[in-house]
A protein has these predicted regions:
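PLP-dependent amino-acid enzyme catalytic core
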Residues: 1, 58-61, 73-92, 170-172, ...
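Short N-terminal binding/cap micro-motifs at the start of the first secondary-structure element
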Residues: 13-16, 42-44
């Protein structure tokens, strides 16, 4: 049985991953562990790790990194706490691979810890662009540390390959978020009108 770790730092990124995590947890050949950090552990964001638990997952550990984006020094402090905590956690717990999505700075620290512990990183949504933001260089840095790349479009797959990654490690799997939206159970017009009244009245979105 392979031991897979998934680290989540925000509700938004977890929401994209939730359906995939249920699929992985149902696979008898994979032992899935989940660690929540970042926004999930911050009361200012509603302690959103509880959402993960309410979805039926067991969280192996909560790692509070004293999240703050007040200024760059606070961000660097949070990153250093995260790097130290995950460095210790990954020393104590041996995993065959670690699953990471995106480009937040706490995920960057997790990736560095995993890379130095020689734990293969499976990175989702690499190759994308967010010009003028930290996300840009963080995402590409994680790409260079990852061993398996799951891109959301062919354009992003090609960009990862252009960065020097072996083509046989880069796959276009599509967008999990877009796929999730196609599976939403949308209300009918009649159901909406039973809640909000006539939809013929003027409205704005």
């Amino acid at each position: 049985m392979k031991k897979l770790l998934y680290v989540t730092g925000s509700r938004a990124e977890y929401g994209i991953m939730k359906r995939l995590l249920h699929t992985i947890s149902a696979d008898h050949d994979i032992e899935l562990s989940i660690v929540a950090t970042g926004m999930h552990c911050d009361k200012n964001y509603g302690l959103t790790y509880k959402i993960i638990e309410n979805d039926g997952f067991i969280i192996d550990r909560l790692i509070d990194i004293k999240l703050s984006a007040e200024n760059n020094s606070y961000i660097i402090n949070s990153m250093s706490i995260c790097l130290n905590e995950f460095g210790n956690y990954l020393e104590e717990n041996k995993f065959d691979a670690i699953l990471l999505l995106g480009d937040r700075y706490e995920i960057y620290s997790v990736a560095i810890a995993a890379a130095f512990h020689n734990i293969p990183i499976i990175h989702l949504h690499g190759g994308e662009q967010t010009l003028g933001n930290y996300d840009e260089f963080i995402r590409h840095s994680i790409t260079k540390m990852a061993k398996l790349h799951l891109a959301s479009t062919e354009t992003y797959r090609q960009r990862i390959i252009q960065m020097g990654e072996a083509p046989d490690t880069v796959f276009n799997i599509g967008s999990l978020g877009a796929e999730n939206s196609l599976l939403l159970d949308l209300s009918t017009k009649k159901e909406l009108e039973s809640i909000y009244g006539s939809l013929k009245k003027p409205y704005f979105v």
